[in-house]
C-alpha cells in the first residue's frame, strides 16, 4: 500500500469515528450508517492491500498480523481466515469503544466469561497473542475473570492507529480468502499466509505463485519416485510392438521387444516361465513383486537392439531360479494361458537320495548323522564316507561278524529272493554268508505256489510266504502267527523290509534303523519313538476281494 493512499484512508477512518461519536451522542441510532461506512472502508482497504507494494513490511506497523494468524491456524482447532477476521473485528470494536467512550465503566472492564470473549476471541486466537493485543490497548489482567483498563501513555492517537490497523487486519483476512479461492484448491490458508508475508505481488500474482509451487512440488515428488519406476520397467508390457519402431510405455521407459520376461507360475513349481513380450497380453494385470528385483536387472536401452533384435540362446536351460514359494504372486498372476512351460529334465538321482533330503540320516555302521550316505555294494548297509574308507568295512568286511542282510521279521533282499525263486534246487547264493535253513527252499516254494493257487483272491502279504518261512523257526503252524513279506519300505533308509512300526507316529522302520532312531523325537505328544513289531500290532484287516499287486 502506498504511503499517500494509506494516509488518506486513515483520515477517512478517523472521520467515520467522529461521525459515529456525534450520531451516538445525538440520537443513539447511527449504528446502521456507521456499519455501512465501515464496510465501505474495509472494501477500499482490501483493494489497496491487494495492489502491488514495494515493501510488504509496511502493511502493518503496530500489529504482528502474520504471526498472529499463523499461530492461530496452526494451534487452534477449527480456526479459519473467516473466524480470525471476526476476532479482529471484535478487537476493533473494543478499541473504538474505549477510544470514543472512555468514561463508561462497561468499556473499562472485559469479563472473560462472556460470550463474545469466549467464542470470538479465546477459541480463535492464542492466549499469548490475545494478551499482547489487549495489553496494547491498555488492558491488564489483574484478576482471573476480567481485564481492567489503565490509561495508556500513548493516549487517543495510539488507540486511533491501533484501531485502524485492526481494520486493515480484517481487510487482509478477506484478501487472503480471495487468494485461496483463486488458487483453485492448490493451496491451503496457511500456505497463502506464508506466501503473502514476503511477496510484493497482488492477489492474482499470489494465486499464480501458489499454483506454480504446487505443480513444482508434484513434479519433484514424481521425480523422487522415478527410480523405482525404472526398476520395474522391465516387467511392464505394451501391446504388440513392432520390430522397427522404438517401444515405450506411457511413462517413457524403453522395452526390448525380443527379450523374454521372467514371470512366476501359479503351478507352485520352482521352474521359471518365459513369456515372449510379442504375445498379446492386453488383459493381463502386472504388479511386480519386490522379490523379483534382484533376480533380473532392468535392461539398459540400446537403439541397435530395437532396430536389429538379436536373440541369443541362454547358456543354461534355467538361468533364473525362484528361491522359495513365497516369491510367487498368487493374486495378480495369470495361468499358463496357452504358453508351454519348458519340460523339466528327468531327474538322475536315485530314489534313496529323495529320502535323504527329508531328514538327517544316520550311518548304520557308526551311528553318526551324515548328509552324504551310500549303501554297501555287497550287503546294502547304509554307511558314511568314513566307514567306507575303513578297511575292512564295519558291515561285511570283518570275518567274525555274522552278517545277515535281512531283518528278523522275514525280509530277504531282492538278490536272495531272485535266487530262491529262480534256482530252488540249487542252493547257491550270491551272498558271502550262506542262508540258514536252505534245505527247505523247494518245499516252501511249492507251498507258496500251492497257496497262491488255492486262494487267488487273498492278498500276497496276508498268508505265510517262503520268505517268512525262511526267517521263522520252522515250528509255527499254518494259522499261528502273522508273518509279513518285506513289501513296505523303511521310513528312514527307504529299504524294503520295514518290520517295526511306531505306535505314536505310525512310522515304519527296519531293525537297523530302529536301534539308531529309537531315541529321536517322535514329533507327537510323546518325546521318543515307540517301535513295536508288526506282528504284535492290534489291528484287524478286512478281507480284500481282489488280488493286490505291489
UniProtKB/Swiss-Prot annotation:
It is found in: Cytoplasm; Nucleus. GO terms for biological process: programmed cell death; protein K63-linked deubiquitination; protein linear deubiquitination; regulation of inflammatory response; regulation of necroptotic process; regulation of tumor necrosis factor-mediated signaling pathway. InterPro entries: PUB-like_dom_sf, SPATA2_PUB-like. Keywords: Cytoplasm, Necrosis, Nucleus. Residues 457-480 are annotated as: Disordered. One of its GO terms (cellular component) is cytoplasm. The keyword Ubl conjugation does not apply. It holds the Pfam family SPATA2_PUB-like. Residues 83-156 form the PUB domain. Its main location: cytoplasm. A motif (PIM motif) lies at residues 320-337. One of its GO terms (molecular function) is signaling receptor complex adaptor activity. Bridging factor that mediates the recruitment of cyld to the LUBAC complex, thereby regulating TNF-alpha-induced necroptosis. Required to activate the 'Met-1'- (linear) and 'Lys-63'-linked deubiquitinase activities of cyld. Belongs to the SPATA2 family. This is Spermatogenesis-associated protein 2. It comes from Danio rerio (Zebrafish). The lineage of its organism: Eukaryota, Metazoa, Chordata, Craniata, Vertebrata. The gene is spata2.
Amino acid at each position: 500500500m502506498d504511503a499517500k493512499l494509506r494516509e488518506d484512508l486513515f483520515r477517512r477512518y478517523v472521520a467515520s469515528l467522529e461521525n459515529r461519536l456525534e450520531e451516538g451522542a445525538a440520537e443513539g441510532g447511527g449504528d446502521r450508517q456507521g456499519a455501512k461506512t465501515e464496510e465501505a472502508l474495509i472494501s477500499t482497504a482490501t483493494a489497496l492491500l491487494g495492489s502491488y507494494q514495494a515493501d510488504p513490511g509496511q502493511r502493518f506497523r503496530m500489529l504482528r498480523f502474520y504471526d498472529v494468524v499463523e499461530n492461530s491456524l496452526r494451534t487452534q482447532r477449527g480456526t479459519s481466515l473467516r473466524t480470525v477476521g471476526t476476532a479482529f473485528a471484535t478487537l476493533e470494536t473494543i478499541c473504538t469503544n474505549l477510544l470514543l467512550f472512555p468514561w463508561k465503566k462497561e468499556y473499562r472492564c472485559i469479563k472473560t466469561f462472556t460470550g463474545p470473549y469466549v467464542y470470538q476471541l479465546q477459541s480463535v486466537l492464542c492466549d499469548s497473542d490475545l494478551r499482547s493485543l489487549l495489553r496494547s490497548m491498555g488492558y491488564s489482567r489483574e484478576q482471573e475473570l476480567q481485564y481492567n483498563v489503565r490509561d495508556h501513555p500513548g493516549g487517543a492517537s495510539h488507540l486511533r492507529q491501533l484501531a485502524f490497523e485492526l481494520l486493515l487486519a480484517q481487510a487482509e483476512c478477506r484478501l487472503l480468502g480471495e487468494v485461496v479461492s483463486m488458487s483453485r484448491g492448490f493451496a491451503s490458508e496457511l500456505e497463502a499466509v506464508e506466501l503473502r508475508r514476503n511477496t510484493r505481488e497482488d492477489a492474482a500474482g499470489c494465486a499464480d505463485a501458489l499454483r506454480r509451487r504446487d505443480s513444482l512440488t508434484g513434479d519433484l515428488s514424481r521425480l523422487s519416485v522415478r527410480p523405482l519406476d525404472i526398476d520395474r520397467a522391465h516387467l511392464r508390457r505394451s501391446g504388440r510392438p513392432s520390430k522397427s519402431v522404438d517401444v515405450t510405455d506411457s511413462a517413457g521407459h524403453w522395452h526390448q521387444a525380443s527379450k523374454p520376461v521372467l514371470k512366476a507360475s501359479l503351478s507352485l513349481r520352482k521352474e521359471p516361465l518365459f513369456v515372449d513380450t510379442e504375445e498379446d497380453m492386453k488383459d493381463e494385470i502386472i504388479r511386480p513383486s519386490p522379490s523379483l528385483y534382484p533376480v533380473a536387472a532392468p535392461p539398459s536401452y540400446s537403439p541397435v537392439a530395437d532396430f536389429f533384435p538379436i536373440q541369443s540362446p541362454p547358456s543354461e536351460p534355467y538361468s533364473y531360479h525362484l528361491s522359495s514359494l513365497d516369491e510367487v504372486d498368487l493374486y495378480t498372476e495369470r495361468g499358463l494361458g496357452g504358453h508351454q512351460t519348458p519340460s523339466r529334465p528327468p531327474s538322475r538321482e536315485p530314489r534313496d537320495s529323495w529320502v535323504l533330503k527329508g531328514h538327517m540320516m544316520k550311518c548304520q555302521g557308526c551311528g553318526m548323522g551324515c548328509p552324504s550316505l551310500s549303501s554297501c555294494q555287497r550287503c546294502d548297509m547304509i554307511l558314511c564316507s568314513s566307514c567306507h574308507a575303513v578297511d575292512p568295512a564295519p558291515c561285511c568286511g570283518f570275518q567274525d561278524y555274522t552278517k545277515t542282510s535281512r531283518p528278523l521279521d522275514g525280509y530277504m533282499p531282492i538278490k536272495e529272493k531272485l535266487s530262491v525263486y529262480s534256482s530252488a534246487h540249487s542252493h547257491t547264493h550270491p551272498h558271502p554268508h550262506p542262508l540258514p535253513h536252505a534245505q527247505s527252499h523247494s518245499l516252501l516254494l511249492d507251498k507258496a505256489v500251492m497257496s497262491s493257487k488255492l486262494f487267488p483272491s487273498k492278498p500276497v502279504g496276508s498268508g505265510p510266504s517262503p520268505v517268512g518261512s525262511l526267517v521263522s523257526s520252522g515250528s509255527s503252524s499254518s494259522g499261528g502267527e502273522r508273518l509279513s513279506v518285506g513289501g513296505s519300505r523303511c521310513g528312514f533308509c527307504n529299504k524294503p523290509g520295514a518290520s517295526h512300526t511306531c505306535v505314536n507316529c505310525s512310522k515304519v522302520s527296519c531293525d537297523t534303523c530302529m536301534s539308531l532312531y529309537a531315541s529321536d523325537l517322535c514329533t507327537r505328544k510323546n518325546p521318543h519313538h515307540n517301535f513295536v513289531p508288526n506282528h504284535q500290532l492290534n489291528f484287524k484287516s478286512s478281507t480284500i476281494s481282489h488280488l493286490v499287486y505291489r
